[in-house]
């Protein structure tokens, strides 16, 4: 776990630097202490059983949120601060998505990814789907239980799981030539996550 603590404390420190925080070394030390305690907990062992989930990363982000919430920051501020720490890491992924969006079969790639992710999530039990429908040019699903939500909720910050929920919206925002993503509801602040992934070609028929 020492490697993970070092990795994520560096990301947290970068987020604090980017946002002009003071007493950064003290804040990073507090974060490292909190994250170590979380990694050493029985709850971490219970949560760290899902192959499709990087629980070390999830806990690291929860620890960041708890540190910032303790300092009085609001949810929107916390989400922006935490995301700023991961900006450089996400840049390469965004570039890859924009390259995929140039390809004529971009929707097919998105479709295959969704189906594979669904199958893997069902297999390891990390996400419970009310339904997952695949039709011509569209995937629609509804998620009623999600271990991302459960972990954030355990630490009393369910609404901040939006950090993970919005990654779908961010990803599809780079596939605008071929894919339309519609989020009807968000599980971090509602009863379920209800999304549609649509082939834009089918909308034009």
Regions found by a protein language model. Name each.
Residues 1-68:
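N-terminal, charged low-complexity regulatory/assembly segments
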Residues 22, 74-75, 158, 178:
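Short coil/loop linkers at secondary-structure junctions
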Residues 51, 104-105, 159:
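Charge-dense, low-complexity intrinsically disordered segments
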Residues 64, 141, 172, 195-196:
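Short low-polarity hydrophobic stretches
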Residues 148-151, 201-205:
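Short, charged/polar, Gly/Pro-enriched secondary-structure boundary elements
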Residues 191-201:
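C-terminal edge-of-domain segments
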């Amino acid at each position: 776990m020492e490697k993970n603590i070092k990795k994520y404390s560096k990301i947290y420190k970068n987020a604090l630097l980017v946002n002009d925080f003071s007493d950064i070394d003290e804040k990073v030390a507090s974060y490292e202490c909190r994250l170590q305690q979380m990694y050493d907990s029985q709850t971490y062992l219970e949560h760290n059983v899902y192959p499709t989930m990087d629980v070390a990363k999830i806990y690291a982000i929860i620890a960041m949120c708890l540190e910032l919430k303790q300092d009085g920051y609001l949810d929107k501020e916390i989400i922006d601060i935490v995301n700023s720490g991961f900006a450089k890491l996400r840049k390469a992924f965004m570039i890859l998505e924009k390259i995929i969006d140039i390809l004529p079969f971009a929707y097919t790639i998105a479709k295959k990814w969704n189906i594979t992710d669904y199958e893997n999530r069902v297999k390891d039990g990390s996400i419970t789907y009310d339904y997952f429908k695949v039709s011509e040019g569209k995937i629609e699903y509804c998620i009623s239980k999600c271990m991302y939500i459960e972990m954030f909720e355990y630490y009393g910050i369910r609404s901040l799981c939006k950090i993970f929920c919005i990654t779908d919206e961010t990803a599809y925002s780079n596939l605008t030539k071929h894919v339309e993503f519609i989020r009807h509801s968000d599980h971090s602040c509602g009863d379920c996550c209800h999304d549609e992934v649509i082939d834009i070609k089918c909308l034009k028929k």
